Amino acid sequence: MAFLWIHVPISRIWYSNLRKCYIKMLYISYKFTIMKEVLIIMWIADGWKEYEVIDTSKGEKLERWGDYLLVRPDPQVIWDTPRKNRGWKHMNGHYHRSSRGGGEWEFFDLPHQWELHYKDLTFNLKPFSFKHTGLFPEQAVNWDWFGEKIRNAGRPIKVLNLFAYTGGATLAAAAAGASVTHVDASKGMVNWAKENAAASGLSGAPIRWLVDDCVKFVEREIRRGNHYDAIIMDPPSYGRGPKGEIWKIEDAIHPLIKLCTKILSDDPLFFLVNSYTTGLAPAVLTYMLATELKPWKGSVESQEIGLPVTESGLVLPCGASGRWCSSR
């Protein structure tokens, strides 16, 4: 297996036993994973040292989170490959999906909480409902991307992080030198993000922590006349607000992107949208960002994001990201 960085002008990419595919962008940088007759084009979060997807099989993935092994369900894993790795029989935690919906954890010598590090960032992990641990490791590929943009901007950058969860993107942006407004509707998630900031040595960083409805917050920022140089959003596929409001990403994502353009500064740096909904293909993210950010000079690229799988040497898809970046 080989990893290649390829900078491609307008052209066709050809590979044996694969159909030709057109790339309709002026210039694109992609990471290619090539294994014999397999060509995978996606953004891969392969900078982890303490996290690893060891294997995938029968609707589940075997992961290493620091010193501990977890088995969790994954809807992308539709293949039934042999489970040869001994970790399948020696896990520290196993999330069992219920036929009635949801599920529950089964633990084997797993602490209530432990730490995981990515470069200079530290995250507090603790398994909780809906199979989660408090971190989405695949997002590291985006942290690296916008962290470099912020560090090379040569000016102060003001970032808005919507649906900010436990703060992975917030901490990555703050560590790169940005001032960040972190917004999430869950008080528990915001407090967890604050704990991660403290563990990462970023307690004194210019981060504004807000428990709020993201759409309503943006609407108020428009009325206040506040603006941001960069926007990050990681909306859920489905959600319900405290007053019964229903969020469906297919219906709400485009209006929210459009709304957010009203709080962009005159010289925005980037706009990042993440999606874990299979119906929102990368091309859909590209279309929305390209149309709504047309007044600003920039380029758009979208792609699946993924995590390398040790046993197979392939990549587990983990959603998609759309990136708009200033061309100035």
Language-model features: where?
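Mobile active-site "lid"/loop adjacent to the S-adenosyl-L-methionine
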Residues: 186-189, 211-215, 228-259
